[in-house]
Amino acid sequence: MKKVLLTVCAIALFGSQAAWADARQDLQQRLNKVNSFQANFSQTVTSNEGALIQKGEGHLKVQRPDLFNWQMTAPDESTLISDGKTLWFYNPFVEQVTATWLESATTNTPFMLIARNDSKEWQNYDVKQNGDRFELTPKTENNLKHFSITVSPNGQIQQFAATEQDGQVSQYQLTAQKVAPIDASAFRFTPPAGVTVDDQR
């Protein structure tokens, strides 16, 4: 009886691993169909009890694997740009720019996963699929508890959401998406005159 139970458990485990691998592969293949896109986004942040913390909006441009321009326009302005090597974060309200190496940037955020679409990074997650919706759970504990993303078969991202360990949820809905090459100037950044530059490279 014990041997039968162990066999059943092993089959269930291997079956789950195969399903995770298939879902992970399908997600990557879908994302690989679109290498360059731009879209508007709306952001909703809620607490673990469902209370609204913040609503925001902005515009993003992505050119995989490592180029992106994320501009938050409301409620406060901020800009996050990757030129492929350096990650620039500009907060005009405090007149400060922070520069870090992209390769050392945290990978446990939804946007970094989407922008890079690196197979090695996806291996750090168990992935379940329900139609066009993919649910990701980190294999090792970090500040990200759960991540979901909805991607159409043609590779267009419709929405993504991240749940942190404290239960806070950040949801992003993409609209007015355009799939087309993006001018390289969108991924270049020069700190404005007079701002403080915190260079952590």
From Swiss-Prot:
Q: Which CDD domains match?
A: LolA (cd16325)
What InterPro entries would the database entry show?
LolA/LolB/LppX, OM_lipoprot_carrier_LolA-like, OM_lipoprot_carrier_LolA_Pbac
Show which residues constitute the signal peptide: 1-21
| Compartment(s) of residence | Periplasm
Question: Cross-referenced Pfam families, in alphabetical order?
Answer: LolA
Q: Which UniProt keywords apply?
A: Chaperone, Periplasm, Protein transport, Signal, Transport
Q: What is its main location?
A: periplasm
- Single GO cellular component term: outer membrane-bounded periplasmic space
Q: Where are the transmembrane segments?
A: none
Which SUPFAM superfamilies does this one have?
A: Prokaryotic lipoproteins and lipoprotein localization factors (SSF89392)
Mind listing the GO biological process terms from this record?
lipoprotein localization to outer membrane; lipoprotein transport
PANTHER family per UniProt: OUTER-MEMBRANE LIPOPROTEIN CARRIER PROTEIN
Q: How does it assemble?
A: Monomer.
* UniProt record similarity statement: Belongs to the LolA family.
Main role?
Answer: Participates in the translocation of lipoproteins from the inner membrane to the outer membrane. Only forms a complex with a lipoprotein if the residue after the N-terminal Cys is not an aspartate (The Asp acts as a targeting signal to indicate that the lipoprotein should stay in the inner membrane).
Q: What is this protein called?
A: Outer-membrane lipoprotein carrier protein
Record organism: Proteus mirabilis (strain HI4320)
